[in-house]
Amino acid sequence: MKNDDEQSSLMVAVIGIIPVIWFALLVAPYLSSGLMGILDGVPEAMNHPFSIRLCGDSVKTVLIFLLSYGMGIGIYISTKKHYRRGEEHGSAKWGNVKKINRRYREKRFTKNKLLTMHVRISYNMRKHLRNVLTVVIGGSGSGKTRFFAKPNLMQANTSFVVLDPKGENLRDTGYLLEEKGYEVRVLDLINMEKSHCYNPFVYLKDDNDVQRLVTNLFKATTPKGSQSNDPFWDTAASMLLLALIFYLRYEAPEEEQNFPMVMEMLRAGEVREDDDQYQSPLDELFERLEMKNPEHIAVKYYKDYHSGSAKTLKSIQITLATRLEKFNLSSLAALTATDDLDLPSLGERKVALFALIPDNDTSYNFLVSILYTQLFQQLFYLADHKYGGRLPVHVHFLMDEFANVSLPDDFDKILSVMRSREVSVSIILQNLAQLKALFEKQWESIMGNCDEFLYLGGNEQGTHKYVSELLGKATIDTNTYGKSTGHSGNYSTNYQNTGRELMTPDEVRMLDNRYAIFFIRGERPILDEKFDILKHPNVGLTTDGNGKPYLHGAVDRAVASISLGDSLEGELTDDSLESEDYELLSDEDLEEIIQKYV
């Protein structure tokens, strides 16, 4: 806009040369008569504006007038001021809720992502040229679940991946989602016997996926803030794990490709510190594989691991066993032995995948970290290789308790490429400090990649300052008063303007719990009420509207169940059973009976 104004001014200045020359030629015949002659002659010349007479002073007069004109233009430019009345110290102000909502929403209510009571945004990113990546920040009790997560689940308009501490979202909205035609799948790390199974090995398409799985596993099982002075042990342990996984991937039957089998192989790799020549069953296994295929990738990694002394090998095994020790638990071993989640299907039909984690124990969160990484890989691959770059069903990650799960170091890059593939995330945090702790160098990039930022309130000073600076400064009018006393006292009032934050950090801290502050890229900030869940049209199908709670893992929701039917009804009664009337059945006998009635 500034360049356009400069071009317009230049054009006017050039055009102004024409009347200057014309006027100079009118004045030229009177130049020799002095100032009085010019003053007397100009009115007469103006009566006949087109009667121009050339004379000996014409050229000199034109040059004098052009020089004066040029000097005038120069003085004008040098003294020109650029005023923005009322915006001298800043132009920040609150956005118009209705106008902004009208610009970004779909007319059909359930086609939108809900942000505040009166603002929603369409998932059709081509409509408004914004991504639907959202950062939600709110302290405990600010309503991150009630005012944001639940309302968007109740929309039932995308596939969902929900990190659900305590299982509250699943219990309250699972029945609604099933009624809306969703397949509900649950990775339950609280009550694992009720969980669908998840086997990361199923989603390994190539050797790079194996490498990423091992890298992510080691990162996710590293305690926060810990730094190893000697990375040798982790590097060597990762080589051993790569060897075991590659062996299972290429040599074992499909039902043995899982982490429980990795633990079996690790236990078979006995090392005797006093006997470097001892060969364990695991050594013999890889020796046979080397004889069969010396260039096998599993053999290469195993030989790299096995190049040390027996004492070193023992330490490496202990390091790896420490990383994988959770898989010794029968509950986790059973959960990861097979797979029921079918991750790619989330991009093809409406599926709600809930990952339930304890809110007071992070022991098993590493499995959710692996799940996230593989979900991104699977969905991106599906979009690129089957659907021309865009999934047929949008997938929305609701990342509650975002700070409790380890994510890839390049998560900011993942954010930047997911939009085009119909994948979005909502990063839910308690404060900005959590994001800075997770991504010390990339946190600003993550915030910048998200076009929406919703602040629900909190009590962390760094977040207050960040929100205040994001709101910007406004220009306000101020008065100053002066009064002097004495024999000739006087009273004065001065009017001036100054800059002031739209909300100071203290005012951000004091934000009414009914309200939220919402930012969308390229728009004025919005102050609006939080979404009232009881006014959602689908609330009657949730527990908040007295609907049925969703109970996963019940008999009627089992993946497979066995019924003996009515054939035995009435045959057995308490009176007919004596101690000598029954016997314990072997597994073979039990299987034969089951096959008879199934």
What are these regions (language model features)?
Residues 130-423, 438, 442, 498, ...:
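P-loop NTPase motor domains
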Residues 357, 361, 401, 429, ...:
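Short loop or secondary-structure boundary microenvironments that flank
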Residues 93-101, 112, 116-126, 146-147, ...:
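A broad, low-specificity signal for short, low-complexity segments enriched in glycine/proline
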Residues 42, 48, 59-112, 207-217, ...:
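Short alpha-helical interface patches
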Residues 176-177, 200-203, 441-445, 469-474, ...:
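Short secondary-structure boundary/capping segments
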Residues 1-142, 146-151, 193, 484-485, ...:
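Basic- and hydrophobic-enriched, low-structure N-terminal and domain-boundary segments
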Residues 415-517:
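Conserved ATP-driven motor cores of ASCE-family P-loop NTPases powering translocation/secretion/packaging/pilus
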